[in-house]
């Protein structure tokens, strides 16, 4: 990602390919963007929160990714440990971020205990991102809501609508033939139908 003055854009684009080729790189230049929230880096976008700019992983895809466990969850106790661990990691990553903050707090409410320093969890990208961060309560500001809207297309009204449902959500779990299954659906407004969240937690 290059962040430059708009006045320098033409000059940079004129010489960028040549400079990168001399450095041994071959790459594709995407169209320029003119706001921080439109930057995409490692499948994440910047969102301005009360604690500064936070790189927020691709939403709502991140909800599906964080609903998958690489650890065997054979009992309700295991599920609760997993839910608590994922939730606390997510809270550290998204404190002050609309929607996602409520999502991870729902996991913590549903969970209990911890797997601790497990080789799988300690080597994940989310674990590295959350390293050194704390999960203290952070207010979601109007500025954060507008910034999240710019980044992911969810208006403050819809953010609050989904958060109201998430804030009252506690996950239930059942052990089926394929392992622990969790079904949930959120009511997503028609305008955001392409982002409809309908997921299923599976552990094999």
Which role does the model predict for each range below?
Residues 7-26, 31-204:
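Active-site and adjacent loop segments of nucleotide-processing enzymes
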Residues 1-5:
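Short cationic amphipathic helices and targeting signals
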């Amino acid at each position: 990602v290059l962040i430059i003055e708009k006045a320098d854009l033409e000059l940079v684009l004129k010489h960028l390919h040549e400079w990168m080729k001399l450095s041994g790189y071959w790459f594709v230049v995407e169209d320029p963007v003119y706001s921080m929230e439109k930057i995409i880096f490692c499948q994440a976008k910047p969102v301005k929160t009360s604690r500064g700019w936070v790189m927020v992983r691709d939403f709502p895809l991140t909800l599906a990714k964080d609903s998958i466990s690489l650890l065997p969850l054979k009992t309700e106790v295991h599920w609760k440990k997993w839910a608590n661990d994922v939730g606390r990691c997510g809270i550290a990553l998204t404190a002050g971020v609309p929607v996602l903050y409520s999502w991870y707090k729902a996991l913590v409410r549903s969970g209990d205990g911890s797997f601790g320093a497990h080789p799988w969890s300690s080597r994940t990208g989310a674990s590295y991102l959350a390293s050194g961060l704390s999960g203290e309560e952070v207010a979601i500001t109007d500025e954060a809501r507008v910034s999240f809207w710019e980044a992911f297309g969810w208006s403050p009204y819809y953010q609050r609508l989904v958060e109201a449902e998430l804030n009252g959500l506690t996950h239930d779990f059942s052990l089926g033939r394929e392992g622990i299954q969790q079904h949930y659906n959120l009511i997503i407004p028609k305008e955001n139908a392409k982002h409809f969240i309908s997921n299923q937690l599976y552990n094999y």
